[in-house]
Structures are given as C-alpha cells and as structure tokens.
A protein has these predicted regions:
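S-adenosyl-L-methionine
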Residues: 1-11
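A conserved structural/catalytic subdomain of Rossmann-like adenosyl-cofactor enzymes
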Residues: 11, 15-250
Length: 250
C-alpha cells in the first residue's frame, strides 16, 4: 500500500505522479487520520471517497516535503499528478467526497478533468472513469483570492470499438488512417489551448463544492444529435437497471 511508502516517495522526490488508486479500497487499510469525519463509513466495506483519499495522502507528502524545503532555505516545488478515478469522485455530492475535494484544493490546483470513454477498462472493470490532473503544492485559490481556471474535456469517443475476447480495438477509416490519431490531435489542441468546443470541452472556475465533470459546463452540439443517440441512451440506461437488479427480464 502507498500508505506505507512515505519515505520511499519522499526519497524519490517526484516531479510527475501517475496513479490509478483502487476505487473501492477497504477503509481498514486507510490511516485513521483521514477517517476522522467518516462516521460509520470508516467501518464500512468500501472507501467512501472513491479513491480521493489516496490523492489527499500524496498531497500531504508533497506539502511535508515543501515545509522541509523551506526550513532548509530551498524554494517550494510543485508536482504534476494525473490520476484515474470513478466519475462519482468528480460529482461529489456526498459530504465525505465533497469534504475531500475542498481539502484537496487548499494546497493543490485542479488543472483538468477528462471524462473517459465508456468501459475504458474493457474487458476488465466496467466503472465509468475520469482522469483528473492536479498541480500538487500550488493552491487552487491564488493569493489574491481568485480561482484557477480548470479545463474539462468530454473525451468519450476515442475511435476504439469493443471486440469480444480482444478488448478495445483501434479503428481505421477507408484510407487506412487511424481514427484515434485524428481524435488525439483534436483533444490535445483543445486541452493545451484551453478551448471550449460544443459537445467536447469547456473551462470553468470551480471550488470543491462544485461538480468536476465537463458535462456540467459544456454546451451541447445539437447539430450532431440523431434519433439513434436517444435510443442508445435509453438502451444504456436499461442495461444499467438490469445490471443493478432494479428491474428483471421476464
């Protein structure tokens, strides 16, 4: 567990961290200091922060490193982090998740959140995921009281298709060109330039009390909507209800 690796992390003195924490870690393995306000959830079966507590832990290590740097007369440093989390962590309408989000922005900046394709981990876990990008060690609220602007990407269609036994397979157009390559270039362009594009991206100044998903801020591109889109949404919702046992096939 990373909770036992603080000395290793401090010695490594990272500039970039890539992390994919467990979405449903058992609370028993999480340090008590992070569970003070969890109530009954601290004795539950799943991490009520949906993985945000792991980000909080690494953030605390970076802050500890910066305090030590200041004592030694050195400049503070920042660390870039990209972390995969379930979308539930970004929505954060439950008190425990919202408290984690608020705490995270005290010492760190939320640079970007990307909503990822459905079943991105196929044929593995079926969780709906997003990627959050933080600058650890730099408060989200500037010294003058203004907020950093966050980029939000609705990156659901990446040009891959699910294939049984093969996973998600890259697709090509009639000329043999990779569909993903063209999509990747567009995604990088809107992100690097903080562009707002209907149906794809948006920027917003958010706090820990807000939703951290593009769907809450982007404008819909109605010119691309088809009847099939509505049918697909209904089909997905029906599949979800069946999976959760809320309805049953007769």
């Amino acid at each position: 567990s990373c909770f036992n690796c603080k000395d290793f992390i401090k010695t490594a003195d990272p500039d970039i961290i890539l992390m994919n924490p467990p979405y449903n870690a058992k609370p028993i393995g999480i340090p008590d200091t992070y569970k003070v306000n969890w109530g009954k959830a601290k004795d539950g079966k799943e991490d009520p922060t949906k993985g945000l507590v792991f980000v909080h832990y690494l953030s605390d290590i970076v802050e500890e490193m910066n305090v030590e740097r200041e004592v030694a007369g050195k400049a503070r440093k920042t660390v870039k982090m990209a972390v995969l989390l379930p979308v539930a962590a970004a929505i954060g309408n439950k008190n425990i998740i919202q408290s984690e989000k608020i705490a995270l922005l005290e010492n760190n900046t939320l640079e970007a959140v990307f909503t990822l394709p459905n079943e991105i981990f196929y044929p593995g876990a079926s969780a709906s995921a997003c990627c959050m990008v933080f600058t650890l060690g730099e408060p989200h609220i500037r010294a003058d009281g203004t907020l950093h602007e966050t980029f939000f990407g609705y990156f659901k269609e990446d040009g891959f298709k699910k294939k049984k036994y093969l996973g998600r397979v890259e697709q090509f157009d009639e000329n043999g060109n990779s569909k993903w390559k063209a999509i990747e270039e567009e995604w990088l362009d809107v992100f690097r330039n903080h562009l707002s594009k209907d149906g794809l991206s948006a920027t917003a100044k958010v706090t820990g009390e807000d939703e951290w998903l593009c769907e809450a801020y982007m404008k819909t591109d109605y010119t691309t909507l088809r009847e099939d889109d509505f049918q697909q949404t209904l089909n997905n919702y029906l599949a979800y209800l069946l999976k959760e046992g809320k309805i049953y096939e007769s």
